[in-house]
Design a protein with these regions (language model features):
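Early extracytoplasmic/lumenal segment of secretory-pathway proteins
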Residues: 24-98, 108-110, 215
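Bacterial N-terminal signal peptides that target proteins for export
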Residues: 1-10
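Ligand-binding pocket segment of bilobal, Venus flytrap-like solute-binding proteins
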Residues: 171-237
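Extracellular/periplasmic juxtamembrane helices and adjacent flexible linkers that interface
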Residues: 252-332
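N-terminal signal peptide c-region/cleavage motif recognized by signal peptidases
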Residues: 19-21
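Alpha-to-beta junction loops
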Residues: 78-84, 143-144, 206-211
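A bilobed periplasmic-binding-protein/Venus flytrap-type ligand-binding module shared by bacterial periplasmic
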Residues: 120-129, 242-259, 276-280
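A conserved helix-loop-strand patch within extracytoplasmic ligand-binding domains
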Residues: 96-170
């Protein structure tokens, strides 16, 4: 793939991707986070074919992509998504908290707390790794520039922030040391894009920064297409990023497509759906598929949000609420 076609495909920030026939008699809108575009370009046609064979019905799957937290707020404010697929549970929780669009116990409706896949935060560096970036400590050196999405608008950014904080805690440090470390890290961040794909554009197209912090599936996609320009660095430890999905009941009922929406989310847990996820470097939750693709995913120490921060609710309140620790750190 040449550079022009890559920038038109991988790095294009379009708001909607349409999959299926324009004359479909049923349609779904899946509101998702920024770096699942390529996955859904393959997943959606697979589901469309599956549904056609099962029911004889032709369906259209519409996609909306952006920073996870920003997308979730759009749905809670009235964007009529039938499905929401995010990279953190809080961005689905707010659909209950703010608008009662889903039940409070939405995570109990599907396996693995409604997360068909997971990922982790890794580093993408320029070819040859000229700044010799090997682990988290290297990111706070004064001559290193780091690109991270905005933790206020992006789940990707939240995970990068929490992964850095957790790295210090896992080494035996305390919260004061972790805050100092993360403060130094964000002093090295020249720009905060609203989502993960925007951060990719900043790093890969605008050539800003020595390292990009983003999800494993995103760095492998970039490496696959532009392998002669970048290297992937796996830190010694990182965070487990879960990718939950849910039917947005209120809107699906309104659109009279609840059964279709439920089948769509369940297809993420099917062997076919899990295969597509693994091929896009999303870690499968179904054991048989995970074992098949075991060699594709680096075995590194991963900690969950609950392990270090107690829960997502606590992490959100302490770190990302207005005036909380991230705001204090970034204003310094």
């Amino acid at each position: 793939m040449n550079k022009k076609s890559l920038l038109a495909g991988l790095l294009t920030i379009s708001s909607l991707i349409f999959t299926g026939s324009a004359f479909a008699n049923s349609a779904l809108l899946n509101v998702s986070y920024d770096v699942t575009r390529e996955f859904y370009k393959d997943f959606n046609p697979s589901f469309v074919n599956y549904w056609k064979q099962k029911t004889g019905e032709t369906v259209t799957i519409n996609q909306s992509h952006g920073g996870s937290s920003k997308q979730a707020r759009s749905v809670s404010d009235g964007l009529e998504a039938d499905i929401i697929s995010m990279n953190q549970a809080p961005d689905i929780d707010i659909l209950y908290d703010r608008a009662k669009l889903i039940p409070k116990d939405w995570q109990k409706r599907l396996p693995n707390a409604s997360s068909p896949t997971n990922s982790t935060t890794v580093f993408l560096v320029r070819k040859g790794n000229p700044k010799n970036i090997k682990d988290w400590d290297d990111l706070i050196k004064p001559d290193v520039s780091v690109v991270i999405p905005n933790p206020k608008t992006s789940g990707n950014g939240k995970y990068s922030y929490l992964a850095a904080w957790g790295y210090v805690i896992k080494k035996g440090g305390d919260d004061a040391q972790a805050k100092d470390f993360v403060t130094k890290l964000f002093k090295n961040v020249p720009v905060l894009d609203t989502g993960g794909r925007g951060a990719t554009t900043t790093f890969a197209q605008r050539e800003i920064g020595d390292a990009l912090l983003t999800f494993e599936n995103e760095v492998n996609l970039i490496k696959k297409e532009l392998g002669d320009k970048f290297d992937v660095v796996y830190p010694s430890t990182s965070i487990l990023a879960e990718n939950p999905i849910a039917v947005v009941d209120k809107f699906a009922i309104k659109h009279k497509n609840q059964a279709l929406a439920q089948a769509y989310v369940e297809y993420h847990f099917s062997e076919a759906g899990q295969e597509i996820a693994a091929q896009h470097y999303l870690r499968p939750s179904v054991a048989s598929v995970a074992n098949k693709y075991k060699a594709r995913f680096r075995n590194i120490e991963l900690f969950s949000v609950g392990d270090v921060f107690g829960s997502w609710t606590k992490a959100q309140k302490v770190h990302f609420a207005d005036g909380a620790l991230f705001d204090q750190i970034y204003q310094k």
